[in-house]
Amino acid sequence: MAVLVLASASPRRLDLLRQIAIMPGLVDPAHVDETPLKGELPVPHARRLAEAKALAVAGRHPGAFVLAADTVVACGRRILPKAEDEATARQCLELLSGRRHRVVGGICLIAPDGRIGRRTVTTSVTFKRLSHAEMAAYAASGEWDGKAGGYAIQGLAARYVRDIQGSYSNIVGLSLFETAQLLDGFGFAP
């Protein structure tokens, strides 16, 4: 039986897969440039990065299933960055405060025979209006580090979420339903 390689350094994606009894045999993060192309919209951006990550890792593991994903947080057409510092985290929170935004998840699976499956999942999230004190406290928490859009819904930021429409696991980092459908469709048996 072919092994499943998770092309991600995200511990959240690994935890999500384990939640549905999928245990990757190997974790091999892809290192690709995640900078949006000029004029690139959120959905094509998430798709492109998921596929680029899968292709980058598949070459190192012939005969394996390779699963990659990318998560993008967007306000309108604007792609928010992964927060790398408190200032960026705060800027993201200011944009998200009191607004609805989208979390777009791109998923790509490459089968041992070279077939490629792709899915894109969009979840709508609405934040309550945040006070300056709430933004400062969240920024000081450090929980935003490396997170798309500068927040982690599975942590402290959950208290700011007024409404979710769509896949919760997509917001965390990997839509489990679509991932399971891809794996099942390609004959992967956990």
From Swiss-Prot:
Entry keyword annotation includes Zinc: no
Active site, renumbered: D70
Entry GO MF terms: dTTP diphosphatase activity; UTP diphosphatase activity
Superkingdom as given in the UniProt entry: Bacteria
Predominant localisation class: cytoplasm
Catalysed reactions, semicolon-separated: dTTP + H2O = dTMP + diphosphate + H(+); UTP + H2O = UMP + diphosphate + H(+)
Keywords: Cytoplasm, Hydrolase, Nucleotide metabolism
Enzyme class: hydrolase
Coiled-coil segments on the chain, per record: none
SUPFAM superfamilies: ITPase-like
Important for substrate specificity, annotated site positions: R12, T71, Q154
Cellular-component GO terms for this entry: cytoplasm
Classification via CDD domains: Maf (cd00555)
Assigned EC number: 3.6.1.9
BP GO annotations: nucleotide metabolic process
Entry keyword Transcription: no
Location of this chain's protein in the cell: Cytoplasm
InterPro entries the UniProt entry points to: ITPase-like_fam (IPR029001), Maf-like (IPR003697)
Function: Nucleoside triphosphate pyrophosphatase that hydrolyzes dTTP and UTP. May have a dual role in cell division arrest and in preventing the incorporation of modified nucleotides into cellular nucleic acids.
Homology family: Belongs to the Maf family. YhdE subfamily.
PANTHER family in UniProt: BIFUNCTIONAL DTTP/UTP PYROPHOSPHATASE/METHYLTRANSFERASE PROTEIN-RELATED, BIFUNCTIONAL DTTP_UTP PYROPHOSPHATASE_METHYLTRANSFERASE PROTEIN-RELATED
Protein's recorded name: dTTP/UTP pyrophosphatase
Organism: Paramagnetospirillum magneticum (strain ATCC 700264 / AMB-1)
